[in-house]
UniProtKB/Swiss-Prot annotation:
Residues 25-36, 53-83 have a biased composition (Basic and acidic residues). Keywords: Cell cycle, Cell division, Cytoplasm, Septation. One of its GO terms (cellular component) is cytoplasm. It comes from Nocardia farcinica (strain IFM 10152). Residues 22-117 are annotated as: Disordered. This is Cell division protein SepF.
């Protein structure tokens, strides 16, 4: 049978009996070789479906007889009473005797070392050192005076000395006002004087300081406009008479410079920025 015929026979397109002799047993002689047409074979003669396959020998009594499933295999001897005997000796577990009430905790169950009183020590207070009363500064033997509660050796500490040392460290250092370079010693304005007259009667003090050769800053902020104008006229005439200079530094603030002191515009600007005229 060709492959195409097998395919058609598989899907029922052609009868299977026409090609059964070639499909089932290739070793059997074909119908053309035997000299005639061959009819279909009985079902029992086909390969694999003979009487020997489903005969009595296959399901004989020897296979499923009482010898195989007899009482000896599944009888009471196998699952008898002697296997699960009630008199078997099993060890009985030991049980503690029951006592009514709550158990009292023993003191030994909670060791005292875990939360003892000496676990956290109280803060120690510094020992006060007091000098023992004595008539002299030193003892007769030339030794140091006796101290009450003093610690001797390398660990000796004087609390009073420590307090004085701490006070000196915390004491603020005096802040020295640093003047600009033009006001330092040796500078052109090192002898400068700032005057704040309250009225026109103090014009004499301004003239005396300027006549001594000292530069004078005249602050007229607190004066009225009338008195300030009179003092400005006085200072201008004074500077002209002594061949000095008269310059305005800020509003109502003027600088009188002697003849030997030359103040530049940069220095006047620095005087106004530093506010030196506000210092007494």
């Amino acid at each position: 049978m060709s492959t195409l015929h097998k395919f058609k026979a598989y899907f029922g397109m052609v009868p299977l009996e026409d090609y059964e002799d070639d499909y089932v047993d290739d070793r059997a002689p074909r119908a053309s070789e035997r000299g005639g047409a061959r009819g279909p074979r009985p079902y029992s003669e086909r390969a694999g479906y003979g009487a020997d396959r489903y005969g009595e020998d296959r399901y004989s009594a020897d296979r499923f007889g009482p010898e195989r499933f007899g009482a000896e295999r599944f009888g009471p001897d196998r699952f008898g009473a002697d296997r699960f005997d009630e008199d078997a000796d099993y060890p009985e577990p030991a049980y503690k005797s029951y006592k009514s009430g709550y158990p009292v905790a023993r003191r030994d169950d909670y060791p005292e070392d875990a939360y003892g009183e000496d676990r956290y020590e109280a803060p120690r207070r510094p020992t006060r050192i007091d000098a023992a009363p004595s008539s002299g500064r030193f003892r007769a033997g030339g030794g140091a005076p006796m101290l009450r509660g003093a610690t001797r050796g390398a660990l000796a500490v004087d609390p009073e000395a420590e307090e004085r040392r701490l006070e000196e460290r915390m004491r603020p250092e005096p802040v020295v006002a640093r003047r600009p370079g033009i006001f330092e010693d040796g500078g052109p304005l090192s002898k400068i004087t700032t005057l704040r007259p309250r009225d026109y009667s103090e014009a004499r003090i301004i003239g005396e300081r300027f006549r001594e050769g000292n530069p004078v800053i005249m602050d007229l902020v607190e004066l009225s406009n009338a008195d300030a104008k009179r003092l400005v006229d006085f200072a201008a005439g004074l500077a002209f008479a002594l061949r000095g200079s008269f310059d305005k530094v800020a509003t109502k603030v003027f600088l009188l410079s002697p003849a030997d002191v030359d103040v530049s515009a940069e220095e006047r600007r620095r005087i106004a920025e530093t506010g030196f005229y506000n210092q007494k």
